[in-house]
Amino acid sequence: MIIMEEAKKLIIELFSELAKIHGLNKSVGAVYAILYLSDKPLTISDIMEELKISKGNVSMSLKKLEELGFVRKVWIKGERKNYYEAVDGFSSIKDIAKRKHDLIAKTYEDLKKLEEKCNEEEKEFIKQKIKGIERMKKISEKILEALNDLDN
C-alpha cells in the first residue's frame, strides 16, 4: 500500500506541474489527478478531503477543467450532489492541440489576405509576421499528425 500512495503522490505532482507549465494553478492539476486516479466519480467534498484544499479552490479548479474538457459532471441516480470524473486525457490533449492549430491556421490565412492589400512599406512587416506564424502552423500540424498516429 505504501508503493500505491507513493505512486499516487507522484501522479498528483506530475499533473500539478503540468498545470503550472500551462499557466494554470497547481491545484487544477491536482484536482484532475485525483479524478484521474479514482475508479469512481467524486464530489467536491471528496476532492477537498483528499487534497486538503478549500471548497472554493476545488470549485474553481473543476470549472476550469470542465471548460478545457478534462472533466465532466456525472449524474448518479438517487444522489443530489454533483459528481465529477476525469475525461480521457489523450482525447482532451488532441482536442486542445486541434483548437490551437485551427486558431493558428486562421490567423495565418487572415494575414495572407492582409498581405495582398498592404502597401510596400507594410508588406515587409506582414511578411515577417507571416513567416513566424507559418512556422507555428507547421509545428502544430506535426503535433496533430503525431497525436493522430499515436491514437491509431
UniProtKB/Swiss-Prot annotation:
It comes from the Archaea. InterPro entries: ArsR-like_HTH, HTH-GbsR_regulator, HTH_ArsR_DNA-bd_dom, MJ1563, WH-like_DNA-bd_sf, WH_DNA-bd_sf. Pfam families: HTH_5 (PF01022). GO terms for molecular function: DNA binding; DNA-binding transcription factor activity. Residues 7-106 form the HTH arsR-type domain. Residues 44-68 bind DNA. CDD domains: HTH_ARSR. Keywords: DNA-binding, Transcription, Transcription regulation. The keyword rRNA processing does not apply. The keyword Zinc does not apply. PANTHER family: HTH-TYPE TRANSCRIPTIONAL REGULATOR MJ1563-RELATED (PTHR38465:SF1). Belongs to the GbsR family. This is Putative HTH-type transcriptional regulator MJ1563.
